[in-house]
């Protein structure tokens, strides 16, 4: 099995704040993994440690079999990273930015990078500071993809993009994955985008993995059980993830299986969005069993 990212007891502290708290995770290569969680869950911290920008406070991490802190030079030539704030030098032109990419990356594909910025109508002589948010996002993604990476790590790549620009970027990402097959970790809180492109889902809460699994398997293994008299129903055949109370109805997200009954309850498959939201909300309240 090709494990591209593996952590064991990974911790990261900033003063008294623990951003990662003994995080254990193993991701198989060749997939697009969606990393989701509330603000402060540790998503950005995990990606920054994975590319060697921060040193962990404890535990172990391996990316493509390498230690990001100790083997940073060797690792960076094999991965592409787009940070959340897409830090590009505003004084450089698009062409100069690509030239820097060419000089710093031994696997750089200049023909591909030039073709990509041309496709998106980005003049090589135009200053980066004059580009729109969507155009800067495309330049940042070009820098990552021009390396022809084995692994691509994207931290909120569609944040602040308009709907058309967001859709174009995601379609381009899917095309790259289909053509070149890099492993991808996509951090995003836009659940529709995660559902559109991700094959594997990791829900991160409080610096720990709440659940990790293939999207199809998560959908198969979760159901919503709702009805007016649900409080007395036996749900011992599964784990209750979340309970929502309405005026006359109770709905439970259940990890497991439940059979319909004649007491007015309804059982249906949960959508991926309902599963993700259920896990995130369950961390804010005690779940009655």
Give the ranges of each region predicted by the language model.
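Conserved structural motif at the start of ABC-family nucleotide-binding domains
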Residues: 5, 20-22, 76
């Amino acid at each position: 099995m090709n494990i591209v990212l593996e952590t064991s007891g990974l911790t990261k502290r900033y003063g008294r704040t623990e951003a990662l708290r003994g995080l254990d995770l193993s991701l198989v290569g060749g997939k697009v993994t969606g990393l989701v969680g509330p603000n402060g869950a540790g998503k950005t911290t995990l990606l920054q440690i994975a590319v060697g920008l921060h040193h962990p406070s404890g535990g172990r991490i391996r990316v493509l079999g390498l230690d990001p802190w100790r083997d940073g030079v060797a690792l960076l030539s094999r991965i592409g990273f787009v940070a959340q704030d897409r830090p590009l030098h505003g004084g450089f032109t698009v062409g100069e930015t690509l030239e820097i990419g060419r000089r710093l990356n031994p696997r750089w594909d200049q023909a591909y990078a030039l073709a990509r910025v041309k496709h998106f109508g980005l003049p090589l002589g135009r200053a980066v500071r004059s580009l729109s948010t969507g155009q800067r996002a495309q330049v940042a993604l070009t820098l990552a993809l021009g390396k022809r990476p084995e692994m691509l790590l994207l931290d909120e790549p569609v944040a602040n993009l308009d709907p058309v620009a967001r859709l174009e970027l995601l379609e381009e990402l899917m095309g790259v994955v289909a053509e070149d097959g890099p492993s991808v970790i996509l951090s995003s809180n836009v659940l529709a985008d995660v559902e559109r492109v991700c094959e594997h889902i990791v829900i991160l809460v409080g610096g720990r993995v709440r659940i990790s699994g293939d999207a199809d398997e998560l959908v198969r293994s979760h159901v919503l059980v709702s009805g007016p008299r649900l409080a007395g129903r036996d749900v011992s055949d599964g784990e209750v993830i979340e309970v929502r109370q309405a005026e006359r109805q109770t709905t439970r997200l259940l990890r497991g299986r439940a059979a319909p009954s004649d007491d007015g309850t309804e059982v249906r498959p949960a959508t991926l969005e309902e599963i993700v939201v259920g896990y995130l909300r369950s961390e804010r309240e005690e779940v009655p069993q």
